[in-house]
């Protein structure tokens, strides 16, 4: 594994070269609190963006062990962190300039569902986040200075704010974990009682449209008294 300083040196050495020289960056680099991996480099600035991942060890992230003690909590924590990371990278996407997809920073977009995704994975060693970056260029000439901004200015802030426990709302995360555990309990009870669904009082069932999972504005909330008398 190489250091972040070596990555900077490599960026300086390929600046203004033709775009394929970016492929020499593929590999893993040790930053202060995480490992940055350049897993796949796009062929040109107009192609699908490059694949990047970061690994933050648990000792750096600082999340309580009970938040990733089993599959349910790991999926819930990973989903929560993906949403936090998406919020952060959205502040910086396309702030680095260039042609085509230059400066793009994107994460898999989450819907309302809490699902297991490749965008974030909780392992025994730490947290792995996977995302996409458009490597900057002017035409098809490398603009390494703009990529340096992404890797050394934007990304460290995003990682610090999204994946370090002390920088997040502990209460919000705790409530998210509790909600997931409550949902898992209800699902098990449905099976035991041979039921197909549980609808809570006050639930909004109609959706905004056939392609939206958002609740319809102004709709009547569910009441079991109105249904069953």
PLM features: what roles do these ranges have?
Residues 1-215:
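N-terminal accessory targeting/assembly segments
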């Amino acid at each position: 594994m190489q250091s972040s300083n070596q990555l900077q040196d490599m960026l300086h050495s390929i600046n203004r070269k033709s775009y394929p020289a970016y492929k020499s960056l593929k590999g893993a680099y040790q930053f202060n609190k995480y490992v940055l991996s350049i897993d796949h480099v796009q062929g040109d600035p107009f192609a699908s963006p490059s694949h990047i991942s970061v690994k933050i060890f648990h000792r750096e992230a600082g999340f309580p062990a009970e938040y990733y003690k089993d599959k349910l909590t790991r999926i819930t924590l990973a989903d929560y962190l993906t949403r936090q990371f998406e919020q952060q990278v959205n502040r910086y996407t396309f702030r680095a300039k260039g042609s085509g997809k230059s400066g793009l920073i994107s994460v898999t977009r989450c819907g309302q569902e809490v699902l297991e995704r490749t965008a974030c994975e909780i392992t025994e060693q730490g947290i792995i986040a996977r995302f996409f970056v458009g490597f900057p260029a002017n035409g098809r000439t490398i603009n390494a200075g703009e990529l340096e901004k992404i890797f050394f200015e934007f990304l460290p802030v995003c990682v610090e704010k999204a994946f370090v426990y002390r920088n997040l709302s502990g209460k919000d995360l705790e409530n998210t974990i509790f909600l997931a555990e409550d949902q898992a309990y209800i699902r098990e009870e449905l099976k035991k009682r041979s039921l197909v669904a549980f609808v809570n009082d006050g639930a909004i069932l109609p959706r905004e449209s056939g392609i939206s999972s958002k609740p319809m504005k102004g709709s009547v909330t569910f009441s079991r008294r109105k249904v069953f008398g």
